Amino acid sequence: MTAQQQLVEIDQVNVEYPVKGWRRPPFRALSDISLTIGAGETVGLVGESGSGKTTLGRAILGLAPVTGGEIRFEGRVISTLGRRERQALSKDIQVVFQDPYTSLNPAMTVNDILTEPLLVTGTSRKDADRRVRDLLDEVHLPADAGRRLPREFSGGQRQRIAIARALSRDPKLIVCDEPVSALDLSTQATVLDLFIEIQDRTGVAYLFVTHDLSVVRHISHRVAVMHRGAIVEQGDAATVTSTPSEPYTQRLLLAAPVPDPIRQAVRREERRAFAAETAAAVG
C-alpha cells in the first residue's frame, strides 16, 4: 500500500502524563509508536491490560496528549488540532466503545440517539429519519427498534445501535475499543461479521483494539502487538496470529482459550513449557 493510500499515519508518537510530586518525571504511556492504517483496512491492535493499546486509540481521537511525534489523517497533522477543528473532524473519525450500555443515553429512544448527531450538523428532520431507517437496516435491527429504549435490547443489539450511531455520518475511520469483549462468544461472532459486512459495503477503515488474538485474526488485515507502551511486533494478521516471532506475542497466543478441551489441554502444556523456557533463558 503506497503512502498516498494511507488514511492514518502515526509517526514516532509519544504520550506522557504528568505525575504528582516535586520534579518527578512524567509517566510515558506510549513510546515511539509508528503505525499506518490504509483506507478500507482493518488494523488489529492487541495487548494485555496496560499495554497502551487503548491510549493509542484515544490519541487518534484527540483524547490523549501527544507529547512527541505526530498523527496524520489524510496527510493532515491532527495531533495538534484545537477543539473546534477536532469537532469538524468527528465526521470522518468515529468510535465504538466496549460497553454500549454506558455509551448510550438510557433516557433517549434509539431514534433520538441516532438522529442527534445528524440534526446538530444541520440535517433536516425528514432526511435524518430516513437515514435512521437505513442505519437500522444496515445493522440488522427491526424498523420499530427506533421507538424503544436501550435497556429493552440485549448486549449484542445495543452494540449494533452503537455501531449504527458511529456510521450515521459516513466516517472514514472507526476506532473500535474492545467492542466485543463484553459479549458471549456466539454474539461476538455475529457482531464481528457485521463489522466485516459494513466494511465491504462502505469502505470504512477500522482500528480494532482488543486483548484477544482470535478476534483480530477473524477481522484484521494487519496486526500490531503492544507491550508496555511500545509496538513489539506487527505484520500480516495470518502470520502474526499463527507463527509470531516475538515471545510476548507467543505468550498471548498460548493464553487464548480454545473450545476444544483436548486442544486446550495441549495449549496449557505448551504454555507451561514456554514459561519454563523463558525463565531459563532469563536466568
Could you describe each region identified by the protein language model?
Residues 1-255, 267-283:
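ABC transporter nucleotide-binding domains
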Residues 260-264:
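Proline-centered turn/helix-capping motifs that create local helix->coil transitions or kinks
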